[in-house]
From Swiss-Prot:
D-ribose 5-phosphate binds at residues 153, 174-175. This is Probable pyridoxal 5'-phosphate synthase subunit PDX1. Pathway: Cofactor biosynthesis; pyridoxal 5'-phosphate biosynthesis. Keywords: Lyase, Pyridoxal phosphate, Schiff base. Pfam families: SOR_SNZ (PF01680). GO terms for molecular function: pyridoxal 5'-phosphate synthase (glutamine hydrolysing) activity. Gene3D superfamilies: Aldolase class I. Vitamin B6 is an essential quencher of singlet oxygen in plants, that can protect cellular membranes from lipid peroxidation. It catalyses: aldehydo-D-ribose 5-phosphate + D-glyceraldehyde 3-phosphate + L-glutamine = pyridoxal 5'-phosphate + L-glutamate + phosphate + 3 H2O + H(+). InterPro entries: Aldolase_TIM, PdxS/SNZ, PdxS/SNZ_N, RibuloseP-bd_barrel. D-glyceraldehyde 3-phosphate binds at residue 104. Catalyzes the formation of pyridoxal 5'-phosphate from ribose 5-phosphate (RBP), glyceraldehyde 3-phosphate (G3P) and ammonia. The ammonia is provided by PDX2. Can also use ribulose 5-phosphate and dihydroxyacetone phosphate as substrates, resulting from enzyme-catalyzed isomerization of RBP and G3P, respectively. Also plays an indirect role in resistance to singlet oxygen-generating photosensitizers. The active site is at residue 16.
Amino acid sequence: LIKEIKAAVTIPVMAKARIGHFVEAQILESIGVDYVDESEVLTPADEDHHINKHNFQIPFVCGLSIPRGAPPPAYRRGYAGHDTGPRVRKPSTGNVVEAVRHIRSVMGEIRLLRNMDDDEVFAYAKKISAAYDLVMQTKQLGRLPVVNFAAGGVATPADAALMMQLGCDGVFVGSGVFKSGDPAKRARAIVQAVTHYSDPDLLGRGEFGLGEAMVGIIVRMRRLRGTPIVLNEVI
């Protein structure tokens, strides 16, 4: 199937491998995929070890899908030789709130790190069982030293622009395009939104004529404590 897809398209092709299954990754590299997704949505092959990316020539991505998402798992997993880096993601639901929560938590933790002195950085790295040089590099850069993509729940051009303005380097969109009313138009509009994410006039024009957004989401209403604001939640 992967070979058929590569023969049919000119865009880069990404394929999934199970966590820790380096032989699957070797096979994917040998048949010519452009990226390997060491995917947390598949059943892991190895619960204790991730694939050593230094043994491969192609870039990898991995998921940063954790409660209150924060850098520690990114240090322990995302920097094990990832050329492309971690992505902030949740399974596709059409609800962008999970991706927003994750990237805000990650960026908030990095802001705290930037205010630490060297001794505090050393203690922090030890506390989270991460390599000191990677933690210090993050402090100096003011960001993760790998590219950071948003994925999961991005269903509109405005969603994509939101994730970019929150600090992501790019956006992965699958179901948000292919489960929409007009996939081709929506994909084109989302690409434009990522490119021109700080231009509200262009973003506004891109929201029209896209057909129905991703459907099939069951939501419930939740009132924020102490406010009149009501949120939709995925059940």
